[in-house]
């Protein structure tokens, strides 16, 4: 019963996603981390677990974070957005790029008016370590 109640507090129904925000984990390039690691780091910061909806690892794995029907917790003021985290800082491998491309295309079909941006476009951060708008125009 407690789990159901806490899920109701966090659950936001069918969120109308308007943005997709791309992040990086700001971990050393090439080091393997995953969604479970990020979940643990976020808990250690006193947060409610992983704030991203999707994590893309250097091994080419797409891992689920929090469900998309839960509000994200990854960009202040923009948490009705899908959050994707690329593991690394500014050097991502071909597998990561391919997964990101496919995931963005899939989400743009699911949410036709979705605006795709980098974390640095809504915050004074260097995250995600690349120019998302250039990538969208030239690589998507």
Where is each model-derived feature located?
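N-terminal cationic-hydrophobic initiation segments that often serve targeting/anchoring roles
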Residues: 43-46, 108
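Basic/polar, cationic surfaces and motifs that engage anionic cell-wall
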Residues: 5-25, 29, 58-62, 67-68, ...
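Gly/Thr-rich phosphate-binding loop signature of adenosyl cofactor/nucleotide-binding cores
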Residues: 54
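Flexible, surface-exposed loop/gating regions in the mature catalytic domains
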Residues: 71-73
């Amino acid at each position: 019963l407690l789990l159901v109640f806490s899920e109701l507090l966090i659950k936001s129904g069918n969120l109308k996603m308007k943005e997709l925000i791309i992040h990086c984990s700001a971990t050393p390039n090439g080091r393997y981390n995953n969604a479970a690691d990020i979940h643990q780091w976020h808990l250690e910061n006193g947060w409610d677990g992983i704030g991203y909806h999707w994590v893309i690892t250097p091994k080419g794995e797409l891992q689920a974070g929090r469900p998309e029907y839960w509000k994200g917790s990854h960009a202040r003021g923009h948490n009705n957005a899908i959050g994707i985290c690329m593991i690394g800082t500014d050097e991502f491998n071909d597998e990561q790029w391919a997964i990101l491309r496919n995931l963005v295309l899939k989400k743009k079909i699911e949410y036709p008016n979705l605006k795709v941006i980098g974390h640095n476009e809504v915050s004074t951060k260097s995250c995600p370590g690349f120019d998302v708008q250039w990538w969208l125009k030239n690589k998507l």
